[in-house]
Amino acid sequence: MEDTTFLEGANLAGITTLMNNLHINEQANLEELEKQVMGKQQSFPTDHFDEELNGLAKSLGINFNDPEFSLDSAHSVISKKPSGRGSDKVHGGIRRDSVCTDSICSDSVCSGSIRSGSIRSGSIRDGSIRDGSIRSGNIRDGSVRSSKTRRGPARNSSSRNDRGYSLSTHRKKYAESEASQKTAISKRDRKNHYAESEYSEKSIKPSTKQVDRLINHLRSNGDPNSFYKKEHDYERKTKLVKLEKINMLLTYLGNEQISTDDIKIPTIDSSMQEIDDVIEMLTLRNVGIRYSSIAEEILIGLARGLEIVFDGTREIPFLNYRPDYTGLHNTFMIKLFKMRYETSQVVGNLVQNMSPLSKICLELGPSLLLYPALIRTKHKASEDLYNLLQKGPEDPFTAYNEIHETLKKNNK
């Protein structure tokens, strides 16, 4: 048989030259390990199948090279050994010493019926053997009769019918079991293949970009050390960008008078994981304050709108009710200050999938509603204070109380 083995590790030739010696155990002999991998052999599945088939045929006494066992042969001898006694052993309804000669007609022999040691060379159907008859399902005197025997159907045809039915039923059940076994094996192999491919994709995907960059660099320069130097420079630049982002967040939080003393500020020598953790903490603290401010502005703007619409002078149709919501925004401010965390969570869940432009509109929208009310309140307070000062009450205590009441009224 042709040798179809091949080296499984042939595609790994020269892999040790791509490895970074700083990340490998010093006691490991890379050249020896590469030789062991390169020397490993693997055979094709068809060779394994042929070995199992030949071993099974040998255990059953079958020789595939013998022409007497060929299905296409007209003279197929099953067994020529007669028993030492008068009664011959019958296996599967067919005698071992029966000989298939030229006188057996075509309708008396078919493939796949004789199960003497799994030899499938012929079958006896409901038809008759013309050069001799089988009596009572067995051959008498342990021999095949000569051409002088009476030609015609066998006497015990019912037994042969039962035997033929049992053989056909057995063949049918065997074919069904074999088909179900193949289906189960194919499903199991397909499931294992998908599991292995999914595992290989998960394990290889994170390092694919780095391997591609290394291969491209080796094709252009051919020096692995220069590649690792570039990787180190790239990591250093990434750290510098992230440290600058940390400084911007610290400056913004400092302007908002938000404490950051509990956060350890990383340096250029810190690991990338530490820098990312600090950025995440500062970002959460920043957006938490911003999101709570957005919620407060929106709700206070709604309260201002209710104050303008329902100031005690307008009546609700069909209810004959005149609500007065003057000063509602002050109550909202006190309540929302106690729920800054909840309001930041609500707004954060709403804006996490929004675009930057939408976030800007959400940030500036409440200010458009609040600005006219703030300007109107400021102008009114200035006018009232000016009129009070121009009036000039004689009692200073009375003037102080009037100014205080005016400011308190305008701040509502």
Swiss-Prot record:
Induction (record text): Expressed in the late phase of the viral replicative cycle.
Compositionally biased spans, kind Low complexity: 116-126
Region 7 X 5 AA tandem repeats of G-[NS]-[IV]-R-[DNS], annotated ranges: 112-146
Alphabetical keyword list: Late protein, Repeat
Basic and acidic residues bias locations: 192-208
Keyword Metal-binding assigned: no
Sequence repeat positions: 112-116, 117-121, 122-126, 127-131, 132-136, 137-141, 142-146
Location of the region described as Disordered in the Swiss-Prot/TrEMBL record: 116-208
Sequence similarity: Belongs to the asfivirus B407L family.
UniProt-recorded name of the protein: Uncharacterized protein B407L
Classification of source organism: Viruses, Varidnaviria, Bamfordvirae, Nucleocytoviricota, Pokkesviricetes
